[in-house]
């Protein structure tokens, strides 16, 4: 469970790797909790839906869903009911990840639905323009992630630092309440420090930690320079 604290923020997306499924997911979440307790960094995890309930009831860090569908309870077989992820113990959700894109009107509907349930929202975007549009919808977070860098090991802060800086500036001009995160290619302490130096409040990452030989050690390295 648990509320989302102040910066710095590390959001660990479990995606659908076997390394972050079932027992592995629980182990990863507990390791994340240990790092959060040892360092004071606000670490949040996004497990797969079937793992939310167990993880949310066994760790004391925020657990969020990877997606919600903008549906009401009823005949929607296979859909992700927002009330269900809340009942399972999630305190928020990703929206519009590059691997689960939705239309702008769906982003708007998902934010409003999440707000009505008290779920925090992290909207993923791919450029400055999309980030600015998302900011008008009043999410809690916008995470800028150029899709070509996701999983590349090349952090956006290196080839395109201006994207982060201009996204932060644009969003804060539109809606200063929205907190900006940086994603794509993040894996080291230098990457996180650079993201914060560019004006973001934290990072969204996955494979750099999930697929590491020692995920806990990788997380400790990630937060070592802030």
From Swiss-Prot:
This is Triosephosphate isomerase. Involved in the gluconeogenesis. Catalyzes stereospecifically the conversion of dihydroxyacetone phosphate (DHAP) to D-glyceraldehyde-3-phosphate (G3P). Substrate binds at residues 13-15, 150, 185, 206-207. The active site is at residues 97, 145. Pathway: Carbohydrate biosynthesis; gluconeogenesis; Carbohydrate degradation; glycolysis; D-glyceraldehyde 3-phosphate from glycerone phosphate: step 1/1. Homotetramer; dimer of dimers. NCBIfam families: PRK04302.1, tim. The keyword Isomerase applies. InterPro entries: Aldolase_TIM, TIM_sf, Triosephosphate_isomerase, Triosephosphate_isomerase_arc. Transmembrane segments: none annotated.
């Amino acid at each position: 469970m648990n509320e989302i604290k102040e910066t710095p923020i590390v959001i660990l997306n479990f995606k659908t790797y076997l390394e972050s499924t079932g027992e592995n997911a629980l182990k990863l979440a507990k390791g994340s909790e240990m790092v959060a307790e040892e360092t004071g960094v606000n670490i949040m995890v996004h497990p797969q839906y079937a793992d939310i309930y167990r993880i949310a009831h066994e760790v004391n860090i925020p657990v969020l869903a990877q997606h919600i569908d903008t549906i009401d309870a009823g005949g929607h077989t296979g859909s992700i009911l927002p009330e269900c992820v809340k009942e399972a113990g999630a305190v928020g959700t990703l929206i519009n990840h590059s691997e689960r894109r939705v239309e702008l009107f769906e982003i708007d509907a998902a934010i409003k639905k999440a707000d009505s349930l008290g779920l925090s929202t992290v909207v993923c975007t791919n450029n400055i323009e999309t980030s600015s549009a998302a900011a008008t919808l009043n999410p809690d977070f916008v995470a800028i992630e150029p899709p070509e860098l996701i999983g590349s090991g090349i952090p956006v802060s290196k080839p395109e630092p201006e994207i982060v800086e201009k996204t932060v500036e644009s969003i804060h001009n539109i809606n200063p309440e929205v907190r900006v995160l940086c994603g794509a290619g993040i894996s080291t302490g230098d990457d996180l420090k650079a993201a914060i130096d560019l004006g973001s409040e934290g990072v969204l990452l996955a494979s750099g930690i999930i697929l590491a030989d020692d995920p806990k050690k990788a997380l400790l390295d990630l937060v070592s320079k802030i």
